[in-house]
Each structure stands twice: as C-alpha cells, then as structure tokens.
C-alpha cells in the first residue's frame, strides 16, 4: 500500500478530450461526462411535434436557408391547410410567451404612424459623450422597449436599498442594461418631450407616457405596476423564477419569426427585461461527483475504486426545494465572499445561487500507488426543451474564482480561466490538487490514531476529522462575457472595462458521513432577499394646528416659569446706587379670588374688592410697570417705591412703580390676580390692568406713565367718570386727603412732559366738575354707587 498520493498521477480538470472514453481510458472522466447520452435520448424517443420543433430550431440557427417543416402524418394536405396549421402554431407560440405579449405588441401601433416615421427619418445632430448620436436607432429601439417595461408611475418612486428611483431613471437603467450605453435621466426626459410633440394624442402613446386615472387604474390593475427590469417578484417566487420544468415561456419560442426593420423585436428577446436576464443565468442542469480510480482502470466513476460522493437525484431537477438565503444558518460567516456580493449595491445579485451540501465518505486506507482523484462538476445553462436560446455557447472569457474557508477563515483562493464552451455546459475547476493533499493528510491521521491501539485516541481523531469537514465551506463565482460586450465596452465614458457578467455563484458545505452511509451531494437554489420594493413618495409634512392660548396662560408664561419671578436682568433694570437688591419671592397664583372679578351678570367688576390680604413691599427696585404686561415701550428706571403696609403672613408680591399723584398719602397695593391695582383697604376702588382702559384715558401713542413726574399731573376733579369705558362698572378714581406715614417720593430727574396737554385748564375743569350731578345715573359715580365715599372733597 502506498503511503501517499502520487502527485504526477493527480487528474487535472482541464485536460482536453481527445476521443471517446473507450479509446482513451486514461483521460479524466469529467471530460467524458456520463450525461451526454441523456441530453440526446429525448430526440430518439420524441414524438412528431418534438421533431418539428427541432426542425424549427435548425431553421432559426440557419436563417438564410429556411426550412418549413412538413407534417409527417398529413402528406396529402394541400398548401392552404399547411399554412393554416402554421398559423395556429404561431398563435400558440405567441400565447406561450405571456398573456399580454401579443396585445402589447399590437398596442404599439404608433411606431408605424406617419409622425413617428417622420421623426425617425430626421438626421441626428446631437452627439453624446460616447461620440455617437444621443438617440441612434439602437438606442431608440431600446428606449421604446423601456417604455413598455416601465409603465407610468406618476410621482411614485421605486425604492431599492434605501434609494428611490423615478420612472426616467428606471428607463435609463433599462437602456444601459440592454445596450451598454449610458443615458441620463435628463436625456430621457428631454427625449420624451420631443416624442410627445410628435405623438401627442395617440392612444397608444398616451398609455405609455400618461398615468391612468386613479379610478381606472384601481379598477383595472388593482395596484401600481412594477418595473420589469428589476422586481422583487424574481426573488420571492421560487417556482416562477427557478422551476426548470414549468418554464412555459421558454418552450417552442418563435423560431421562424424575425424582427423586421422599423419595428421592435419581440418582447421576449429583450435581454434587459427581468424574465430574460433571469433565464439567461438560470442553471437547468447540474452534476457533481468525486471518486478515486485505481491504476490502469478507466477513469470514470463506473470503474471507481472508491466514491467519495455523487449527485443524488435527477440532473435537471434538484432533490431539495429552493430556500431563502436568510434561512441558511450563519451564511455570512460561512460564506464571506457571498456576503460581500450581496452587500454590493453597485453589482446586484442577478444570477443563480446554488447551495451544494456534500456528504463525504472517506476511505479507510490509502489507495494504491498512482491512483487518480477524479472530480466532475458540470453546470448546464441550456433549457431541456428550448436549448441554447440566449447564446450561452457564444459567450467567452469564462472565469472561475474559488474561495475555500475553515470557520470563515480563508484557506485557499484561486482564479482560473475556463476554456470556451461549444455548448451550454460549463465545467468549473474545483481545486483537485488541494483535495488530494487534504484527503491524504486526513487518512494519515486516521491511520496513526488506529495504530496507537488506544480507542480514545481513535475516537478523538474521528471527531476532529468530522469537525474539520463541518467547518469547511467554499464559494465559487462564474463570470463570462457576451460577444456584444466587446463592441460596446469602451463606447461610453466612465466605463472601466469590466464588461463580464456574473453567471452563477456556488456555495459549498461539507460533512463526513457516518459509518455504513454512502456519500451523496444535494443541490438547491438559494433565494436572496428582495432588494427592490415599490413605495409611494411620502406626503409633505403639514403643520400641526395647536389650539390658541388663553390670555391667562399667556400672562403666566410671560411673567414667570413655574411660579417663580426671574431676577431682573441688567437691560431691564438700572439700579440706584443707594438701593440694595433683594431676591424675588415665590409667587403662588391664588385661586380663591378669581370669582370676585365677575359680577352676577357675568361681566368684569372693577369695583369689587379683592379680599386677599396684602403684604408690605419694602424698598424694592422697581422694574417695568405692570400696567401693560405686553408693552415694550416702558423705559426702565430706578425708582424707589413707597411702602404699602398690610398684614403679614402672605408672600411678598411684585414691586411696582407707585403712581405719582399730586396729593400725598394715596398708596396703592397691587391685586395679584390679572394685575389689578388696588388702593388701601379703606378705599374700595380697583384699577384693572387693561390696555383698553389706559388708552381710553391717555390715548394709544402717549408717553408711558413711568416717565411722568408727580408734579406734572394734577387730578383736578372731585369724581371723574370717563364715558365709553367698560359699561356700568366704570373706572373710578377716588381721592382722600390722608397720609400713611410716607410721603410721595420724588424722582431723581424731573423733565418736562406732554401730559399737561392732555387735560384742559384748571378753570375749565372746575366748571365741568361743578356742573356734574351727584345722581346715581352717572354710570355708578353718584352717591349711591357701591364703594363710593360721600365725604366732601375739595377740588384742586
């Protein structure tokens, strides 16, 4: 027995096949695949219809020598009957593409209209950055197909990975996918406007450029149509996307129909559409085997000395159903390369992702010397019925990149060029040299553990081997280049030369079988999460209508925060050098005297006394007058206030300017609800803080009261009632010649004011007062008025 594998006997996967298997038994089996016969057997036992389809395929392959099939069972039919049968077959083929394809083609009648043909005959003057006309015939055809594939969406957006796309952006992307030439959103919009000037009013054109009314669209379509170049349906519906035996759209395509000049090609030939992109990269056949052959034996799995694993189930149908990628436990850590592909927003996953779960049955001993390891990996992109519809056999520059990981850590990375295939089958390489060395090492470790004679060591070696295979994973990426990409790769600016297309991604998971089990491999398709969802644009945020604030809440919010008066700021207060600053006390808004402001009739009663006991205000620095809580024209001054004596025990209230009158001894205390001025308790007169009341006295544009000196305003009336005030509860001011211990305080500066001009002369005031009646009809100012003192007062 050999102690290792012979390196020169390792079978490489890229050996060329020089003949049949029987003549060259030393060749690798993967070059003489065992499923060649299975691909051709269906022609031998096919019925007449299948043979006719084969003839149609030959006619499509060689268009210069068309061959119309002759029915084998109806040789005596006349030519008219044959034409009728061909017409019926043509209709069936049209219906096999889709329910709306024929009607969609018929609705594009504006392409044959005189106006559109006139536009197409115009010379192309504009040249793009790629040096070609902005809308050449090729781009014009792609543009028309993009209009069909991306229906009008109005102001809605098509969202993908956090980015929104409008219809014009989708059309530009569609054109790029179809032709490889970039056209911007603005170019698409401008082209739509130009065509609209020619075709406006045409029903077919209006259908493509105008969104249907909400009533019609909701009743006919039910929901907004989705763009066809990238939709979430291709990821969420595994049966429609991957079902290899249910693809009715690929069976019996229109082989005998050719697109004619001036019209669009059939919709199902649009390689940029969602259906065709998915179909071009869909794998319809798969095979994987790994075996060892003894020396001098035919290098095929039928003559294998030992089979590590082989495919379970049919070559064309997976034994396991499709599964969402997110359901694979730890797929990001197991397949780092796949995670980077999925997260790449610039290169979305538009190909098949195949998961292969490989169970390996290891050898119990070393193979004979000069044994060969065979690995066969085949992927078939051809449909079993339609064959190579999309020209996969014409693609070249096939490459395969392989990444093998252990616990997510990269063990090996390789990039191989594959030979150009002449069929729809591709044979990727799978690192046979690395696998041969790995199998040799695993077998050697197992033999050493068994030779030790210690069962515990043998069990530990077996567990280590199982854990090693369980931690193994691999990712393979297949890419190829279509022939048209060579012509279009460098014809627009900004292209970096990577015109290859990702054709398939294979991800591998491994495990070791239990004793007595056979190594098998199963494959299934993985469905990545959808990366496009249709969302409407959010509506503009409208303003929130808040209820209006009441006057009480405005006064409270303006005067204080949480019941505390703020310390006067420097710009609000100019202190006198001889005055001392004291902190404002807490103000507790009372609730027991609010009702006293209203008389039984529901109106404000300015004559009703507030029964709240007042405190003494001792020589505080006066701030702006509270006569007008909203006024900003009251200039701050440093004015010492008089002392108003009252019962102690209640919190100290606001310091305010005293009202400088020409008669000493009239001290005023402030009612602390709604800013009322209240005289001493022996006088029952309230002065309400109201802009309307003050303006009725002095006018709206007069100088503030703070700036008036006590020697410039003479109150020359026994009792005064101002007409037009607040009604029956008129605003009164009573005067009593008595002193409270403190005379009026003089202001520091006495400047002339214009207050004298507001009042008539003293003689005229005497005459007016003398003529006034003391009756009760003077708006409550007579002797019977509430709160009025009948004592005689000398006029000033």
UniProtKB/Swiss-Prot annotation:
| Keywords per UniProt | Activator, Conidiation, Nucleus, Sporulation, Transcription, Transcription regulation
Q: Which PROSITE patterns match?
A: TEA_1, TEA_2
Disruption phenotype annotation? completely abolishes conidia formation and leads to the formation of compact white colonies. Produces extremely elongated and immature phialides with defective morphology.
Listed Gene3D superfamilies: TEA/ATTS domain (6.10.20.40)
Q: Which domain of life is it from?
A: Eukaryota
Any idea which residues the entry calls the DNA-binding region? 128-202
Q: Where is the composition biased (Basic residues)?
A: 84-95
Record's compositionally biased regions (Low complexity): 235-247
Question: Where would you find this protein in the cell?
Answer: Nucleus
Q: Where is the composition biased (Basic and acidic residues)?
A: 115-132
Q: What does this protein do?
A: BrlA, abaA and wetA are pivotal regulators of conidiophore development and conidium maturation. They act individually and together to regulate their own expression and that of numerous other sporulation-specific genes. Binds to the sequence 5'-CATTCY-3', where Y is a pyrimidine, making both major- and minor-groove contacts. Plays an essential role in the differentiation and functionality of phialides.
Q: Which family does it belong to?
A: Belongs to the TEC1 family.
Q: What is this protein called?
A: Conidiophore development regulator abaA
């Amino acid at each position: 027995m050999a102690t290792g594998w012979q390196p020169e006997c390792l079978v490489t996967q890229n050996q060329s096949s020089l003949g049949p298997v029987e003549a060259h038994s030393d060749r690798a089996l993967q070059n003489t695949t065992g499923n060649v016969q299975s691909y051709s057997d269906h022609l031998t036992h096919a019925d007449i219809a299948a043979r006719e389809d084969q003839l149609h395929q030959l006619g499509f392959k060689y268009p210069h020598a068309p061959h119309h099939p002759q029915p084998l069972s109806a040789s005596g039919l006349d030519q008219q009957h044959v034409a009728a049968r061909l017409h019926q077959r043509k209709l069936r083929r049209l219906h096999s593409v889709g329910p709306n394809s024929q009607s969609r083609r018929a609705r594009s009648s504006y392409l044959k209209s005189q106006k559109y043909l006139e536009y197409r005959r115009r010379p192309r003057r504009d040249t793009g950055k790629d040096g070609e006309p902005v809308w050449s015939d090729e781009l014009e055809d792609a543009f028309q197909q993009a209009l069909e594939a991306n229906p009008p969406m109005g102001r809605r957006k098509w969202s993908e990975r956090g980015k929104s796309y409008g219809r014009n952006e989708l059309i530009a992307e569609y054109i790029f996918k179809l032709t490889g030439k970039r056209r911007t959103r603005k170019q698409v919009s401008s082209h739509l406007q130009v065509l609209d000037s020619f075709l406006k009013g045409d029903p077919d054109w209006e259908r493509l450029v105008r969104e249907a009314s909400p009533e019609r669209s909701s009743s006919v379509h039910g929901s907004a149509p989705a763009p066809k170049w990238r939709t979430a349906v291709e990821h969420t519906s595994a049966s429609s996307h991957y079902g290899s035996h249910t693809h009715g759209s690929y069976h019996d395509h229109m082989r005998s129909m050719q697109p004619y000049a001036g019209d669009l090609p059939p919709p199902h030939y649009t390689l940029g559409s969602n259906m065709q992109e998915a179909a071009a990269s869909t794998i319809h056949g798969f095979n994987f085997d790994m075996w060892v052959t003894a020396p001098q034996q035919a290098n095929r799995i039928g003559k294998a000395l030992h089979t590590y694993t082989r495919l379970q189930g049919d070559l064309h149908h997976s034994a396991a159903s499709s599964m969402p990628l997110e359901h694979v436990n730890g797929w990001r850590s197991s397949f780092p390369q796949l995670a980077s592909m999925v997260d790449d927003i610039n290169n979305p996953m538009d190909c098949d992702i195949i998961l292969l779960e490989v169970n390996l049955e290891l050898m119990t001993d070393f193979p004979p010397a000069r044994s060969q390891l065979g690995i066969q990996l085949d992927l078939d992109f051809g449909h079993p019925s339609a064959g190579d519809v999309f020209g996969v056999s014409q693609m070249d520059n096939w490459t395969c990149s392989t990444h093998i990981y252990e616990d997510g850590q990269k063990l090996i990375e390789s990039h191989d060029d594959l030979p150009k295939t002449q069929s729809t089958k591709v044979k990727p390489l799978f690192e046979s040299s690395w696998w041969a060395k790995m199998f040799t090492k695993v077998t050697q470790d197992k033999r050493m553990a068994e030779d030790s004679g210690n069962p515990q060591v043998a069990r530990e070696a077996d567990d280590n081997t199982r854990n090693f295979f369980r931690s193994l994973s691999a990712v393979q990426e297949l890419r190829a280049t279509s022939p048209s990409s060579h012509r279009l790769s460098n014809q627009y600016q900004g292209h970096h030369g990577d015109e290859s297309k990702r054709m398939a991604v294979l991800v591998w998971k491994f495990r070791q079988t239990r004793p007595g089990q056979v190594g098998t491999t199963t494959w299934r398709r993985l469905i990545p999460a959808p990366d496009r969802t249709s969302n409407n644009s959010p509506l503009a945020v409208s303003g929130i209508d808040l209820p209006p604030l009441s006057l009480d809440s405005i006064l409270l919010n303006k005067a204080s925060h949480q019941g505390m008066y703020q310390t006067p700021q420097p710009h609000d207060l100019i202190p006198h050098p001889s005055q001392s600053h004291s902190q404002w006390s807490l103000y507790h808004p009372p609730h027991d005297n609010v009702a006293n402001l209203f008389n039984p009739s529901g109106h404000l009663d300015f004559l009703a006394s507030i029964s709240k006991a007042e405190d003494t205000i001792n020589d505080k620095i006066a701030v702006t007058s509270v006569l007008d809580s909203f006024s900003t024209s009251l200039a701050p001054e440093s004015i010492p206030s008089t002392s108003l004596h009252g019962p102690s025990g209640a919190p100290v209230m606001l310091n305010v300017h005293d009202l400088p009158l020409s008669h000493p001894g009239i001290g005023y205390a402030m009612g602390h609800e709604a800013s009322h001025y209240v005289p001493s308790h022996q006088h029952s007169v309230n002065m309400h803080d109201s802009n309307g009341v003050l303006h009725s006295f002095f006018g709206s544009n007069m100088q503030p009261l703070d700036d008036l000196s006590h020697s410039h305003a003479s109150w020359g009336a026994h009792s005064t009632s101002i007409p037009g005030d607040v009604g029956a509860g008129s605003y009164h001011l009573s005067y009593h010649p008595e002193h409270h211990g403190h005379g009026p305080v003089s202001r520091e500066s006495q400047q002339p004011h214009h207050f004298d001009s507001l009042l008539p002369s003293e003689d005229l005031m005497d005459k007016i007062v003398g003529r006034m009646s003391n009756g009760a009809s003077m708006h409550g100012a007579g002797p019977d008025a509430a709160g009025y003192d009948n004592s005689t007062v000398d006029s000033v």
